[in-house]
């Protein structure tokens, strides 16, 4: 991993022996949240996921646990990049972070890390975002993508 772009510790837990139970828990939670996302963002969901790809099957990429220590970061980026099949990004915050550590979008919106909060947004270039460094506490998230 290039530390000028991203500095954190990442662990992919999908298809890793010993992580099957956690994988099932995240899968159930993701499905519940995607159903809610589709209800509240139906037109956007259908446009970005189904119409543009002409596909009806959507799958998740699995789950990556990320630990970001104080002063670690992820620079401005979008999640589609060279992975054209990525359509939505999902991020679960696993702990509260009091100072810094937020996800910031290029619109100025800042999402504070709060345990149990999940965020879903398009993985496309208009949703540029970054992981702002936590100042004093370590931040834990689980992230992944819906793809077609």
Predicted regions and their residues:
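Fe(II)/2-oxoglutarate oxygenase catalytic core
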Residues: 1-118, 126-148
């Amino acid at each position: 991993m290039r530390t000028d772009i991203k500095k954190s510790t990442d662990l992919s837990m999908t298809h890793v022996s010993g992580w099957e139970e956690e994988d099932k828990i995240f899968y159930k939670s993701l499905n519940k949240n995607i159903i809610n996302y589709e209800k509240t963002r139906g037109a956007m969901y259908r446009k970005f996921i189904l119409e543009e790809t002409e596909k009806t099957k959507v799958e998740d990429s699995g789950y990556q646990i990320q630990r970001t220590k104080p002063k670690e970061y992820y620079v401005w980026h979008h999640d589609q990049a060279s992975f054209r099949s990525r359509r939505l990004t999902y991020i679960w915050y696993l702990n509260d972070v009091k100072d810094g550590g937020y996800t910031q979008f290029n619109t100025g919106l800042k999402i504070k890390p709060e345990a149990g909060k999940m965020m879903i947004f398009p993985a496309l270039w208009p949703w540029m975002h970054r992981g702002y460094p936590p100042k004093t506490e370590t931040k834990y998230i689980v992230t992944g993508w819906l793809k077609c």
